């Protein structure tokens, strides 16, 4: 795979597509376009390329596509094929004060790769492939534009290794996106999140300088960890072009369990006890009764599915802990795990729901075990209180010794009599209020407003409060590394020289 997968067609001819977000867009003049063309393998100002580069998988954009609109198009799409070309593009744009929005598979759901202020969309899919692999030390170099299936097939077929990173967007996303958004995979309890896997980075700064961070050993005490500075920065501090990662032998053993709990809180406590004892099954997912009904046809219980893969001795020990801590639960058919595996990455219903008039999205947050049951109840109640809500539900998707991620789903629909103009306004108001309710409850509980989807545009308005005084530190780092503010402006809630950040 070498190209992004659009979430839904745009219902307009390329030349008729319009921008939905109202912002001051920066043009690329003929001279800069020529110089970029000389520096980069491919540049395009074709309407169809600009339209696709003007959106990602942000759910609001699905509804707009049905009206022939995208969030915001760039003036030009640049497609480099190596780090030197990325460096040249950034140096030229920095000199010209033209914004640059880096992107890979554009599978993000928070608008992080939308070029809000026009300028250049930097498509990194051409920087693909697996570099050096040290099978003895279990270290591999992966280029930023490599899509998930190509990572796993390259490591497994050639070396008998796995990265162990399996996000829901596996088929749609790239190494660079995983790093930039601080992603997490479905097997993360065993293998860690992307920040646990990465050892070092190659990064291009706003002025074109190429820097390498970390990667020289399993650990160092050489000042602050600069690798982690860029992980989760969403392209606002630099453009990641390559990463060095810990990898693992493909495991020999696998085991599965499925049980049900009388309450979501009871299931959460079982997960807490499992992690507390040091067991870390790759998959430990707890669904509330609403989602248990939707996913497993078991609305009478709160389903916990468990899947682990490891050396057989370690696997047996892990599953023994799971069995002991779930002894009081209802035993369920382990085929529920097969059912999850078959559908875990299926998001085919998303676009049809939006096109049918249903507003639907997911919000993942994280908090300590001590507050999770109360946070779950508070969010589901708050979402249910937003006028128009059809359903509000949750599952626990990633767990730690000290807490877990709650992954909420909400869906709403405007009143039947709403006319098209009124419906458009209703969608924006409902969507924003639903997000506000989840985020407010999370902040009040002392939790993290995002676990693995990132901030992008959609959550930018919350980050200053979510980080507190540390947000000023982030803004200072941004100013130091990108003094002209060209890198992905309008994201993470950071100040931008290009004008007010638009919102629908």
Predicted region positions:
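N-terminal flexible segment immediately upstream of the FAD-binding catalytic core
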Residues: 1-91, 108-138, 289-295, 336-360, ...
């Amino acid at each position: 795979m070498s190209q992004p997968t659009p979430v839904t067609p745009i219902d307009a001819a390329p030349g008729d597509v319009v921008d939905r977000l109202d912002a001051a867009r920066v043009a690329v003049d003929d001279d800069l376009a020529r110089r970029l063309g000389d520096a980069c393998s491919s540049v395009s100002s074709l309407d169809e390329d600009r339209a696709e580069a003007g959106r990602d998988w942000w759910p609001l954009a699905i509804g707009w596509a049905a009206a022939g609109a995208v969030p915001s198009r760039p003036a030009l799409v640049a497609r480099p094929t190596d780090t030197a070309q990325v460096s040249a593009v950034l140096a030229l744009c920095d000199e010209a004060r033209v914004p640059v929005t880096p992107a890979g598979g554009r599978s993000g759901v928070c608008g992080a790769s939308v070029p809000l202020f026009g300028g250049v969309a930097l498509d990194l899919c051409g920087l693909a492939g697996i570099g050096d692999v040290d099978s003895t030390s279990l270290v591999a170099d992966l280029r930023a534009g490599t899509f998930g299936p190509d990572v796993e097939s390259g490591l497994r077929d050639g070396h008998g290794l796995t990265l162990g990173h399996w996000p829901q967007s596996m088929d749609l996303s790239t190494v660079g996106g995983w790093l930039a958004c601080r992603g997490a995979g479905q097997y993360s309890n065993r293998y860690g999140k992307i920040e646990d896997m990465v050892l070092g980075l190659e990064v291009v700064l706003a002025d074109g300088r190429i820097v390498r961070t970390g990667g020289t050993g399993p650990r160092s005490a050489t000042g602050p960890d600069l690798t982690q500075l860029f992980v989760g920065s969403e392209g606002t501090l630099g453009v990641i072009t390559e990463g060095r990662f810990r990898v693992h032998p493909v495991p020999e053993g696998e085991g599965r369990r499925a049980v049900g709990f009388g309450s979501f809180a009871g299931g959460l406590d079982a997960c807490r006890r499992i992690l507390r004892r040091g067991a870390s099954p790759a998959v430990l997912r707890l669904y509330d009764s609403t989602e248990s009904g939707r996913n497993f046809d078991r609305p009478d219980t709160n389903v916990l599915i468990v899947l682990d893969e490891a050396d057989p001795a370690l696997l047996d020990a892990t599953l023994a802990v799971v069995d002991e801590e779930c002894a009081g639960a209802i035993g369920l058919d382990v085929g529920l795990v097969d059912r999850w595996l078959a559908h875990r990455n299926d998001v085919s219903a998303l676009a049809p729901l939006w096109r049918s008039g249903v507003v639907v999205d997911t919000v993942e947050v994280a908090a300590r075990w001590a507050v999770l049951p109360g946070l779950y109840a508070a969010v589901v109640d708050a979402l249910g209180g937003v006028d128009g809500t059809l359903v509000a539900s949750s599952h626990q998707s990633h767990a730690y010794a000290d807490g877990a991620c709650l992954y909420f789903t909400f869906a709403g629909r405007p009143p039947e009599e709403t006319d098209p103009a009124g419906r458009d306004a209703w969608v924006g108001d409902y969507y924003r209020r639903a997000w506000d309710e989840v985020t407010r409850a999370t902040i009040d509980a002392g939790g993290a407003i995002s676990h693995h989807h990132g901030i992008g545009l959609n959550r930018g308005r919350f980050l200053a409060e979510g980080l507190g005084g540390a947000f000023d530190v982030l803004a200072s780092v941004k100013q130091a590394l990108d003094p002209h503010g060209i890198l992905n402006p309008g994201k993470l809630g950071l100040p931008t020289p290009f004008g007010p950040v638009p919102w629908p």
